[in-house]
């Protein structure tokens, strides 16, 4: 995001109010924190996300989560985690406000951590996995990890022309959808893509997290259509490429989302190169605001086994020790409601003689390889193990939301 693209007046007011709210909370102490305090930070989180301030938004999300735990006297509340992310939120809000007031474009872009946005006329994708974060009385967030695919007719024709062997496109070309690839990252077949959505959760609104996926979006689609194993076409959308090379999709008022045919060629995506990950780590230059998860990358883990040791528990996660390629990976699953479905799926996978391929997000924490599993790859495609498949009563959902 560029500074000139922002509503600087509105953004400055929001950032200054956020900084003041944090300062007031620190001056008066946590004992004065209430549901209203949680709502203030939660509204700031939603506004930051809508404004495209991804780094501030993700930081506020964690601070809101811990503050909610404190006000509800939840045993998993972590004072260390809360103070870290609250302090980080204050630093980012003050820094961004200062950059806006001084018209410092370079500093603004560094703190927002956003890449330039590219308009895309048409983009056909499939979903490999979904991460879910649910904080009662605050929000429910989903992040869909996808790959770009060729339209069905073109994909079949290309396969026949190449003797049944797919040929990867080169960067700097124009693809069949009319999207021009550039040296900075063309939107070509196989490109990693993300689309995320956040839903506010009202106090005492006891709904299954997955029920929010059935709510209509502004573009007249429901997010559930992304997890039915079918092609989905985004029209008149926007893509911003992160430093990792992953593209983040955003939608405008004129954007469209259409579900297509069932997708079957899932096995083509199952690959991961540890060597490439090592190269990225060697080229990485750390900064004072960086987090471990900002170095995360999508991985496929094959031929893994459970190590013969008990599960380990932290403040917020259950840790499954896995053996992979002679090394160790810690697979972490939330202890909360948002991790219940994955815990059941992972327990089932551990018990199987032939372990399924795991798709997930890996980052490096305290010299450990840490994996957040998202799905298991089967013959018919991914099993979205983070999401419950229980039937949603749409009438009850709309009634609960007063829609």
Region annotations inferred by a language model:
Residues 1-403:
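Helix-loop junction hotspots and adjacent acidic micro-motifs that serve as functional foci
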